[in-house]
Amino acid sequence: MPPILQPTRRQFAQGALAGLIAASTNVRGAFAADDIKLGFNGDLSASPSAQSGRAAVVGIQAAIDDLKAAGGTLGRGMTLIIRDDLSQPPKSIQNMSDLIDNEGVVAVFGPTNSGNALAWKQIPNQKHIPVMGCIGSATAITKPMSPNADNYMFRVGSVDRTQVVAILAYAKKNPNTKRIGFLTETTGYGQGGLKDLEEIAALQGLNIVANEKFNVNDTDMTSQLNKLKDAGADTACVWAQGTPIGQVMRSMDKINYFPIVLTSWAADNLTFINAAGPALAEKPIFLRTVSESRNPRQQQFFDRVRPKIDADSAFSFSVHGYDATMLLAMAIKQADATDGVKVREALEDLKGVYEGYAKTYDHPFTKTQHEGLGAADQRWTCWRGGKLAAFSDDVVAGLRPEDFKG
């Protein structure tokens, strides 16, 4: 069978990134000098998650176009200034300071990789610049720097802890799960997920028999998997980016060890199925924020952005980027200003209802809750026949609100 994706990831990244930069340049040229400046700081070319960053930018720019067509925000246009952080924390920190101090942006979107957000979240908090996360899902990203401190980190996207609560509820409910093994990558994303896995497993009283780690660029995880196998793990919880999850599946195939695989939403990334292959890709189950059973309005937006994103699976990040931009614009209008403090306060008490593409938002944030999407907004997902599909079985059907502990 030919590969699912013909161009290489690098070729896709180079072509897509050039298009994003060109689009950003066109937006700059279309608006006046007093445009409201927004920034994007995230990986667009380097890591397995870069396609998610590119898709988010497409969604953000689509929202900017629609706001312009509707008359602008406070009578002004918006400019998106894009910075590729190459998945490198030092570069991401540099980008953040540049966007705020030199470009004068009033808000920042991103990053793609959770570890980078954790590396620089003190910067926007110190400088009072709201951040609208729409890709990175580490639980700690939206936590305040200290108890009761003003918090400028918001998110419209998935949250690791929410996913972990759900997949471990599935494991606890599944009669075939008796012994669980954890397998996580050593990045900030992987280890943030591990922290959630360990905490929620303890709360739910689950039997964890192995806890192994691997590097994000590893291609052979048979040593770690043999330790899970020797411990009798019948279920593996894998927390990693798309490509390494695919390598885990290939490593399982090498030793003919196929436990139940519950994993992070990074398995929806095209890099996962390209690494695993179509057959092995069908084994894990995971959660996403956008169902493959799209409603007519979502389908219309999908048709609009699909030519600009790498794959169908990246659509959810365009949705997150679009909805996050619209919520930010609502806050700016409500505040009648672009001042960071006033915009943060408006976000925490948004008036009115916004019908987004992920959900209908009604007072989505508060002073202490900065997540736009919650447990009720998650969708069980798998791969079938080389395409994402809704997943359901007797365990999913039997899950009840009281099962989601943590």
Name each region found by the language model.
Residues 17-21:
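Hydrophobic helical h-region of N-terminal Sec-dependent signal peptides
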Residues 22-29:
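C-terminal segment of classical bacterial N-terminal signal peptides
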Residues 2-15, 31-406:
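Extracytosolic ligand-binding ectodomains
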